[in-house]
């Protein structure tokens, strides 16, 4: 199996090689037309069209690192087991999920280099697009936003990553570590400059999907608020996040909750930031990303009845990674009960899967599974770019990065922790709960925020960094990976002989069950060193000025 999409760009890559590689095939990634021919930096970036092409190239790099971004952050959380077809199906994901990874983990190195590829493309725009047209000023503002976005991930995951604020000359390639303080200041500066530039538009109204396909003023403010929140600047966070909310340009999607991760809600009223996709059959394979294949259930191990295929429209040809944990299910039940609307829209029990004619095939079992299945990330045939029953993973669902629900939850936390408006904290949380068909709360604590955020945004790439900043990671993740469950059909063992029982024809007898300790690991769980990810060894090998994070 193809296991990872590794970026190979480093912060010291030569301009010519990288620029030539990524400036082709941009038209279908965003609503940006690309015209003209490529030249060197001395005669490029002179027109609006060239500025837009440079933005499209930056967004291709952003798209290309998305899968690694999603895998790393969600494997490190307690929302899901790795899953897959068998133990070892994707060893790098298992290492992350069980905290047994080292400096050579390909997903970590792919994310690290992918983030710096985005930084490099942003630096190209910021330094070379110098015109004063509205298109060029917007290009620079967007570049500053994405540079800040990349450094938010670098500082929260690596802490001491190198700060590259300009295009490097050969003598500067060996950049040394920065500090969290310097990186946070850089994130704030870039977002503040993007916001104050006047070049980022606001949506015309909550349903303005065209504006949502690009970075808006409110999106930049949302990320500035997030940066403040992570630094404990609660009053500042509350102020800027309130501005996003008070703009009334965004609202929670009021359709079916289980469609929030599907094409019908691309750039909807709740969308803050998404990697754009296009339903263009001529560009279908050019838009292929591994992400969708990984999320769907394990087609080879399961049967799909007519109800699943035709009434629910479930897509086939997927690999079955990311199975929800019982811990996540129990958290839902505690908050909503076993019949909770948001629970059933997010995940299903095996019995509920049977109701839609989904079943594990006799003689097979699912590794990293406790009998629960994500429903919110199910693949649908209606989301396919092209209609082909044998392979339904060419989806045009936008890749979600932030939605408005996260803004409400962050704002509530900022008010609670900063001694701000208790009424606003209650109002924001109750907007989330009302959509989830839950009774409103009369007061809100940090514990309420934590619980609501886990349920609302599970498997949406926020949980691990939240656990770390809250100081909860060791308590929550310390035992993760000790046991890996499996669910399905297992050979029935004769307790008196220890041998597999057989029927009259000599065939093995299977029993359907959960094996909670199908795999037992001697090394597992979050340790102090996992507060920061390791700098990839590939970077250490080529840059003598980088020092490794503590414990690695």
Set out the residue ranges of the language-model regions.
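TPR-repeat structural position
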Residues: 234, 421-422
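Membrane-proximal, proline-rich intrinsically disordered regions
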Residues: 26-73, 541-552
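Structural register within alpha-helical repeat arrays
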Residues: 140, 147, 217, 224, ...
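Elongated scaffold/linker segments in the mid-to-C-terminal portions of large proteins
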Residues: 49-50, 55, 66, 89-110, ...
């Amino acid at each position: 199996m193809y296991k990872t999409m590794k970026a190979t760009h480093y912060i010291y890559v030569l301009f010519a090689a990288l620029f030539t590689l990524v400036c082709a095939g941009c038209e279908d990634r965003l609503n940006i037309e690309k015209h003209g021919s490529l030249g060197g930096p001395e005669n490029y970036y002179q027109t609006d069209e060239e500025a837009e092409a440079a933005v499209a190239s930056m967004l291709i790099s952003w798209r290309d690192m998305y899968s690694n971004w999603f895998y790393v952050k969600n494997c490190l959380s307690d929302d899901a087991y790795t899953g897959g077809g068998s133990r070892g199906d994707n060893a790098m994901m298992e290492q992350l999920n069980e905290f047994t990874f080292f400096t050579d983990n390909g997903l970590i190195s792919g994310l690290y280099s992918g983030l710096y590829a985005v930084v490099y493309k942003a630096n190209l725009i910021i330094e070379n697009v110098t015109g004063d047209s509205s298109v060029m000023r917007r290009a620079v503002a967007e570049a500053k936003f994405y540079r800040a976005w990349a450094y938010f991930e670098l500082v929260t995951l690596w802490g001491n990553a190198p700060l590259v604020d300009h295009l490097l000359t050969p003598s500067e390639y060996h950049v040394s570590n920065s500090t969290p303080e310097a990186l946070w200041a850089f994130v704030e500066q870039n977002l503040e400059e993007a916001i104050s530039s006047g070049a980022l538009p606001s949506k015309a109204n909550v349903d303005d999907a065209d504006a949502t396909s690009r970075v808006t003023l409110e999106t930049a403010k949302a990320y500035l608020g997030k940066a403040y929140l992570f630094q404990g600047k609660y009053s500042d966070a509350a102020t800027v996040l309130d501005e996003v909310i008070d703009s009334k340009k965004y609202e929670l999607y009021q359709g079916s909750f289980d469609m929030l991760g599907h094409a019908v809600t691309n750039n909807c009223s709740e969308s803050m930031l998404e990697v754009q996709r296009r339903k263009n059959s001529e560009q279908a394979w050019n838009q292929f990303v591994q992400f969708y294949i990984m999320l769907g259930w394990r087609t080879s191990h399961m049967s799909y009845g007519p109800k699943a295929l035709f009434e629910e429209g479930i897509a086939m040809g997927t690999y079955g990674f990311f199975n929800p944990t019982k811990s996540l299910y129990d958290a839902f039940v505690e908050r909503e009960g076993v019949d909770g609307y948001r629970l059933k829209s997010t995940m299903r029990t095996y019995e509920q899967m049977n109701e839609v004619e989904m079943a594990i095939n006799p003689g097979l079992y699912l590794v990293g599974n406790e009998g629960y299945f994500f429903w919110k990330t199910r693949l649908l045939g209606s989301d396919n770019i092209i209609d082909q029953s044998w392979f339904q993973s060419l989806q045009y669902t936008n890749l979600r990065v932030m939605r408005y629900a996260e803004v409400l939850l962050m704002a509530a936390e900022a008010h609670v922790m900063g001694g701000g408006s208790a009424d606003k904290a209650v109002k924001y949380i109750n907007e989330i709960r009302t959509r989830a068909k839950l009774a409103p709360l009369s007061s809100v604590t940090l514990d309420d925020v934590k619980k609501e955020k886990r349920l609302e945004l599970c498997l949406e790439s926020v949980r691990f960094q939240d656990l770390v900043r809250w100081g909860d990671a060791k308590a929550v993740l310390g035992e993760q990976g000790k046991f890996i469950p499996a669910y399905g059909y297992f050979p029935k063992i004769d307790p008196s002989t220890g041998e597999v029982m057989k029927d009259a024809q000599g065939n093995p007898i299977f029993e359907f069950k959960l094996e909670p300790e199908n795999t037992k690991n001697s090394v597992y769980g979050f340790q102090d060193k996992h507060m920061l990810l390791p700098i990839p060894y590939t970077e250490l090998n080529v840059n003598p000025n980088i020092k490794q994070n503590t414990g690695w």
